[in-house]
Amino acid sequence: MLSSSFERNLHQPLLFIDKDTRVVIQGIGNQGQYHSRLMREYGTKVVGAVHPKKAGKIIAGLPIFKNMKEVVKRTDANASLIFVPAPGAAAACIEAAEAGMGLVVCITEHIPQHDMIKVKKVMKETGCQLIGPNCPGLIQPGTHTKLGIIPTNIFRNGKIGIVSRSGTLTYEAAYATTQAGLGQSTVVGIGGDPFAGQLHTDVIKRFAADPQTEGIILIGEIGGTSEEDAAEWIAKTKLTQEKPVVAFIAGATAPPGKRMGHAGAIVSGGKGTAEGKYKALEAAGVRIARHPGNMGKFIFEEMKRLGKI
């Protein structure tokens, strides 16, 4: 039987987070402590952390709880940020979902793919939204809320939604849209692993429904079909007639069979190429930026073309 906290926490904001998001940290080591402090300085409501051997203590200004069920009961948390090392990260994701979290953001890299299959099954069963793993997290400048390791100084409240498989290219797009005076509504780093919790289409659907988001930047990588699937949805809904979309795909020069950075960034069997992704996106009406330095310029031009600025 579902707990009342589970039922309550399923009612998550359209763009995953808002000013009322209450965050618990799983994995309060050096990185967890450091980034939880930065999140609180930015304005995020971080309400506690979980460590089974340190329950009852205060670490980095946060009360420590034995497990996720206890922290939900005591703090009314509705989102979890995971810094647990790879061997235990999948179990941490599952514990968070089963405790009633509406959102789990997993920063951890190198989680075994077999473990992630189990995690995705639990997420589907519980209705919990997973972002990551192997991702920088997400940020919402208008509410001063972020979960993850994203640096805050380049972000400004504004009109552009950014969804990206690459952390550093996310920051490039954010800086460019800030410099162009457009700012960002919400920025989501979905991560580069083969079994990601959110794919491009999942996030773009939310941007399409969000009134503050007036334009979208999609940053992809070689490998997988997330970008092609997004192109299909964009074409079917004629999204670019209402909200412009600009896309950049990383890894265009990668030789077949060579992994480029992320575990999912690999071309195999002739599928997952940058050119194939560009072709699908362009056919859907998406403006293609073949150099990351053009992302800000092109979204500004597209916004102007549609009379949004």
From Swiss-Prot:
One of its GO terms (molecular function) is nucleotide binding. It is an enzyme of class 6 (ligase). InterPro entries: Cit_synth/succinyl-CoA_lig_AS, Citrt_syn/SCS-alpha_CS, CoA-bd, CoA_lig_alpha, NAD(P)-bd_dom_sf, SUCC_ACL_C, Succinyl-CoA_synth-like. The active site is at H262. Residues 1-9 form a transit peptide. GO terms for cellular component: hydrogenosome lumen; mitochondrion; succinate-CoA ligase complex (ADP-forming). It is found in: Hydrogenosome lumen. HAMAP family: Succ_CoA_alpha. NCBIfam families: PRK05678.1, sucCoAalpha. Belongs to the succinate/malate CoA ligase alpha subunit family. Heterodimer of an alpha and a beta subunit. This is Succinate--CoA ligase [ADP-forming] subunit alpha-2, mitochondrial.
